[in-house]
Regions:
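Accessory carbohydrate-recognition regions in carbohydrate-active enzymes
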Residues: 1-181
Length: 181
């Protein structure tokens, strides 16, 4: 989900690494999470895919796992439930029975998750992840019971941009608010 000339591109991400600059590939069977920075139409790029968010229920899993079998917090998704149009995306995360929605405004992105009742639910954040590697520095500040802010710095040392052979350096600043519902 994005807007013309928008500063964020909220998208499901199906795999880290590989030929996946947009973050999403239809042939994959699982979603690793939803990221707020993407590039599309450029082939393999190896950067962005930052601020990964994944809703989960049940036992805590601290890594994403791998497409095709290694357990983690990623989830299979119901392709027939996908709805995508300009500025909006919706899908059912089958393993958790969570409905996920994404939308964007010119300067922000929003996610909404509908969790199954009577399940231990959580929203997991991966601040180190980027499509082609990891960010090299992360900082988080807890603002209040429902808000965090911070930044992540991405440099060639963390991979990306041709496996770190380029000189891509960028910093992503963020603020996240979590309603108490």
């Amino acid at each position: 989900a994005t807007t013309p000339f928008g500063m964020v591109q909220v998208s499901p991400n199906t795999i880290t690494g590989g030929d996946n600059g947009s973050g999403y590939s239809y042939e994959h069977e699982t979603i690793e999470g939803f990221a707020f920075t993407q590039m599309s139409g450029i082939g393999w790029y190896g950067d962005l895919g930052n601020l990964l968010v994944m809703p989960t229920v049940g036992d805590l899993r601290t890594n994403s796992g791998k497409e095709g079998g290694v357990a983690g917090y990623r989830s299979r998704y119901d392709k027939s439930s996908e709805e995508a149009k300009a500025g909006y995306y919706k899908v059912l995360l089958s393993d958790y029975q969570i409905q996920a929605e994404a939308t964007a405004a010119p300067h922000s992105g929003m996610l909404r998750f509908v969790f199954p009742e009577n399940k231990q639910s959580r929203i997991q954040l991966d601040l180190a992840r980027r499509v082609g590697g990891t960010s090299t520095y992360q900082a988080v500040q807890v603002i209040d019971d429902h808000t965090i802010a911070g930044r992540m710095e991405c440099t060639p040392e963390g991979g990306g941009w041709g496996n770190g052979e380029g000189s891509s350096r960028y910093t992503v600043y963020f603020m996240r608010s979590f309603p108490n519902r």
